[in-house]
């Protein structure tokens, strides 16, 4: 009896390590709740492109019968704004009325040819106007109280007369293809009653979002005081201060599309693979249009995929970037994960033809915690011809229809053929908690 009891005790104690091992294995394979958050952390800018211009000859001035050109990209609804000094004046400048020179007809056809009819002469309001001409003394007499900017239409506040801007300056647009234009300024004032040189100047193109320009008055505003270095152009022909200011307003603005989040195990990243063409399972729709629903539905049928979510931002659907003091959009999702699970995400670079952000390689270890923004890359889906991001007539989110191409998926270089992007971690942030 004692022997039997002793054997039973040993059997019980001998089973304890096996029981503990079994419990440990069970604990390791138990589901764990984690939370993923994706944020648009881009400190956005309102201008997609800008620049300065001057004559390339011995003098930076554009004299009568001289011309210069500069190139830019633009989508339908965007406009070209520029300013330069009416040289033989005290504080007058040339500029189109805001928001700028129209670049596309309402049907989307690029506008070409003479657009001089959109040019005007403006008074900066900081100097008393003398009779325009070679004898104007600079800087002249300051206004006792600076006035607001106003159009000079025939005569100025002192009664001096002026020919129409369109007879002094000729503006010509040429469409170069793929949303790119060349604008040429020609000084045609030589044979008029108001001959004048033109100074170096500044030009700008505003982003457009939801049909509205982010900055419809980038260089000046009629009826408002001059600002940001415009006086230096209007009085002295010095474009450096306004050029520097506008450069600081120029950069990247892009929303992110509703985010695709996938949990998978035992397979490679199921969303994409660099070096191969789009698989035709819905990634093209995500990359071109920001629509991840088709890809999510397909992935739910793939062996090894445990869950697929499409996360729209509350109220806005898309994840907007930071705009001034307004925080960027974000989305979150609780996930049930276990040992060996991986997480992959994808979201469209909204103002592109077919670029998308996605986890690189084989995704993220689902049981880790922290900031995984460094695990995100920017990729070209290879299904649409690229244009300047945020200024492409065929970009879907700018009311365009993408132009088809067929190339392997590849990382977007930075700098790229169009612009220099911020670091990816300065655009999208991914956190697991």
Locations of regions flagged by a protein language model:
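Beta-rich interaction/scaffold domains
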Residues: 1-2, 16
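Bacterial N-terminal signal peptides that target proteins for export
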Residues: 2-11
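Compositionally biased regions
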Residues: 5-6, 241, 340, 376
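Short, ordered beta-strand-loop transition motifs
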Residues: 11, 175-178
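Bacterial Sec-dependent N-terminal signal peptides
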Residues: 15, 19-35
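Structured domain cores in non-transmembrane regions
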Residues: 30-112, 178-180, 189-357
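Mature, soluble, non-transmembrane domains
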Residues: 65-68, 73-81, 85-176, 191, ...
């Amino acid at each position: 009896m004692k022997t039997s009891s002793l054997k039973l005790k040993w059997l019980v104690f001998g089973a304890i390590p096996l029981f503990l091992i079994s419990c440990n294995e069970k604990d390791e394979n138990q589901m764990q709740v984690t939370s993923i958050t994706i944020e648009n952390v881009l400190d956005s800018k309102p201008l997609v492109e800008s620049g300065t211009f001057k004559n390339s000859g011995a003098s930076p001035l554009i004299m009568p019968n001289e011309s210069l050109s500069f190139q830019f990209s633009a989508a339908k609804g965007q406009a070209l704004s520029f300013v330069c000094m009416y040289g033989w004046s005290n504080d007058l400048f040339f500029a189109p009325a805001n928001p700028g020179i129209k670049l596309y007809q309402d049907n989307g056809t690029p506008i070409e040819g003479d657009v001089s009819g959109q040019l005007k002469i403006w008074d900066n309001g900081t100097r008393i106007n003398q009779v325009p001409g070679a004898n104007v003394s600079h800087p002249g007499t300051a206004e006792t109280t600076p006035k607001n900017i106003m159009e000079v239409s025939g005569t100025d506040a002192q009664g001096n007369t002026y020919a129409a801007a369109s007879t002094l300056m000729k503006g010509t647009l040429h469409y170069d293809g793929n949303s790119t234009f060349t604008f040429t300024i020609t000084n045609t004032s030589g044979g008029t009653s108001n001959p004048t040189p033109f100074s170096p100047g500044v030009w700008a193109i505003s982003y457009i979002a939801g049909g509205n320009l982010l900055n419809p008055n980038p260089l000046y505003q009629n009826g408002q005081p001059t600002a940001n270095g415009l006086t230096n152009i209007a009085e002295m022909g010095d474009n450096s201060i306004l050029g520097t200011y506008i450069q600081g307003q120029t950069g990247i603005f892009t929303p992110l599309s509703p985010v695709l989040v996938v949990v998978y195990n035992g397979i490679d990243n199921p969303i994409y693979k660099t070096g191969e063409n789009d698989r035709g399972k819905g990634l093209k729709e995500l990359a071109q249009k920001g629509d991840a629903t088709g890809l999510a539905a397909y992935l739910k049928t793939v062996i090894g995929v445990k869950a697929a979510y499409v996360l729209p931002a509350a109220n806005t659907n898309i994840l907007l970037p930071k705009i001034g003091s307004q925080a960027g959009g974000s989305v979150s999702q609780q996930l049930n994960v276990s040992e060996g699970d991986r997480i992959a995400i994808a979201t469209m670079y909204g103002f592109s033809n077919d670029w998308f952000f996605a986890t690189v390689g084989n995704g993220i270890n689902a049981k880790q915690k922290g900031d995984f923004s460094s695990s995100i890359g920017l990729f070209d889906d290879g299904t649409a011809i690229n244009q300047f991001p945020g200024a492409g007539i065929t970009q879907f989110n700018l009311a365009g229809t993408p132009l088809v191409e067929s190339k392997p998926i590849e990382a977007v270089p930075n700098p790229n053929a169009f612009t220099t992007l911020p670091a990816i971690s300065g655009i999208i942030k991914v956190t697991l908690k």
